[in-house]
Amino acid sequence: SYTRKSRKYSSYKGKVGTVAPNRIRRRFNTHIPHQKITTDTTEFKYYEVDEKGRMTMHKLYLDPFMDMCNGEILSYGIDKKPSAKNVMDALNETIEITADCPYRRTFHSDQGWAYQMKVYSHRLKEERIFQSMSRKGNCLDNSVMENFFGLLKQEIYYGVVYYSYEELKSEIERFIKYYNDCLLYTSDAADD
């Protein structure tokens, strides 16, 4: 759904499943890799020419999972529509990647419909992972991911028009690789 004022994508559909407590409570920092993970969904627009030669707008959705220890994007899904499969595939990959954590993990999100799904919360329970959710309508509760989205869109999206799904998808994937390989390394070196 969309809010009239900003037209920003909102995955909130009301209470459609499990709403978990906010376990993170803006305590984003951890020195333990793979202990605190955050996720969210963001939307991008691109254009294609239809069979009648008209320019039509389409959307692409990105579902990344980020390690709060170092900001690394551990896994992500990209699709033409918001989909449970996209979120679950990225979730399962992240669960596998973070299985080496010696402490109980916490996966944080907003209250979007995908994170309220029974299959999502059941998968976390299966792995003894705490589920945490931001308070309704409070983007500051997931500011780590919101900051990443802001950086991503500033670097590759604002002021640029994409003319195909593949072009936009490829640019997002290139940026995530660059972000993980170069930007995080640079920021880690600055902290030393």
Residue ranges: model-predicted function:
Residues 130:
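Residue-level detector of anion-binding/catalytic polar loops
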Residues 185-192:
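Conserved small/polar residues in nucleotide/adenosyl-binding loops
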Residues 72, 100-105:
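Short, surface-exposed connector motifs at secondary-structure boundaries
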Residues 1-33, 138:
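Basic, flexible linker segments flanking DNA-binding modules
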Residues 58-59, 76-100:
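Active-site beta-loop-alpha junctions of metal-dependent nucleic acid enzymes
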Residues 26-74:
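An active-site-proximal beta-strand-loop segment
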Residues 10-15, 109-111, 117-118, 133-153, ...:
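RNase H-like two-metal-ion nuclease catalytic core shared by retroviral integrases
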